[in-house]
């Protein structure tokens, strides 16, 4: 658990982060979102003391993060930046092994961990471990950057605009990889983004920052349905809000008995994807199938549209 208590960072008379308090639960994903200059990166960097607070405290599992030397704290907390930050003169395997080497793991354990992480990120160790960063694509470099941050088995992973430099297709894959890895290891993830769509997609909770303050800290559903003020409302946007809301839930519990023709919609599809398919194909109803292709019932376009309305 990460607890921020009255956290403040001033540069002269300017409060870049101003009296921020909230708690991030273990094994969760927290998105810190806001416009440029809102204080989001400074806030995150105070968790691992890359930036020291002026006032307030950061507690990690009840322990003040100032009780450990900064270098030791940072070895326990994974950190990923936008442009991967890989050492260009080291191979992929050597990059991933950086922190395990620093903390004294033996060679066999390091080699096993490097191979495990490369396989998890679908990078064949026999092919990629000996490559250098310049021999990788942008998406591969970013995956290696995340693997390096996870190498020493940290409980916490901090990520600063981790997907901002990736093209849309690679970005979607990288986001899916991150959620799969988080589910496997149970890592507590805190990431900074200026993209509300990304925050809604990845975050269990979202902290919205404006002018150094957290103006709302809530679940994606609450952020979408009950924005705290006009700033949050504008940040969400109105044009595709219903679709964003639908993206948070699956179609499984909306399936009705009945039959319909045409290509089926997967039971684990989001309501947003299901509605998009029905609109695009011009259908009012579609069959729903499980992963084995067995028909489970039907989903109606009218029901999905009704679910997109703002909750009362």
Question: What does each of the following model-derived ranges do?
Answer:
Residues 48:
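Helix-to-loop junction immediately C-terminal to a conserved catalytic motif
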Residues 93-101, 111, 115:
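Short helical segment in ABC ATPase nucleotide-binding domains corresponding to the A-loop/adjacent helical element
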Residues 108-127:
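Conserved ABC ATPase "signature" region
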Residues 153:
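Conserved catalytic motifs of ABC-family nucleotide-binding domains
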Residues 157-160:
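Catalytic Walker B motif of ABC-type/P-loop ATPase nucleotide-binding domains
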Residues 217-218, 226, 298:
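ABC ATPase "signature
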């Amino acid at each position: 658990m990460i607890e921020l208590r009255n956290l403040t960072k001033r540069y002269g008379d300017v409060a870049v982060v101003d009296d921020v308090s909230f708690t991030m639960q273990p094994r969760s994903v927290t998105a810190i979102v806001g416009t440029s200059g809102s204080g989001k990166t400074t806030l995150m960097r105070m968790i691992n003391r890359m930036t020291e607070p002026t006032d307030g405290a950061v507690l990690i599992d009840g322990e003040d993060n100032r009780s450990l030397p900064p270098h030791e704290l940072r070895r326990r907390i994974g950190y990923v930046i936008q442009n991967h930050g890989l050492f260009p003169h080291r191979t992929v395997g050597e990059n991933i092994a950086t922190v395990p080497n620093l903390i004294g793991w033996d060679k066999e354990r390091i080699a096993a961990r490097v191979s495990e992480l490369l396989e998890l990120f679908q990078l064949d160790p026999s092919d990629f471990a000996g490559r250098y960063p310049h021999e990788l694509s942008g998406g591969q470099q970013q995956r290696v950057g995340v693997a390096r941050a996870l190498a020493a088995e940290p409980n916490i992973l901090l990520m600063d605009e981790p997907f901002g430099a990736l093209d849309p297709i690679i970005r979607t894959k990288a986001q899916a990889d991150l959620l799969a890895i988080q589910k496997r290891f149970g890592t507590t993830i805190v990431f900074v983004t200026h993209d509300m769509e990304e925050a809604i997609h990845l975050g269990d909770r979202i902290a919205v920052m404006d002018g150094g303050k957290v103006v709302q800290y809530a679940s994606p559903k609450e952020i979408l349905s009950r924005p705290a003020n006009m700033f949050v409302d504008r940040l969400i946007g109105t044009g595709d809000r219903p679709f964003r809301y639908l993206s948070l839930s699956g179609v499984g519990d909306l399936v009705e008995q009945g039959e319909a023709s045409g290509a089926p919609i997967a039971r684990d599809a989001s309501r947003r994807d299901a509605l998009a398919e029905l609109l695009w194909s011009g259908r009012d109803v579609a069959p729903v199938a499980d992963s084995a292709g067995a028909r489970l019932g039907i989903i109606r376009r009218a029901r999905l549209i009704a679910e997109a309305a703002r909750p009362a």
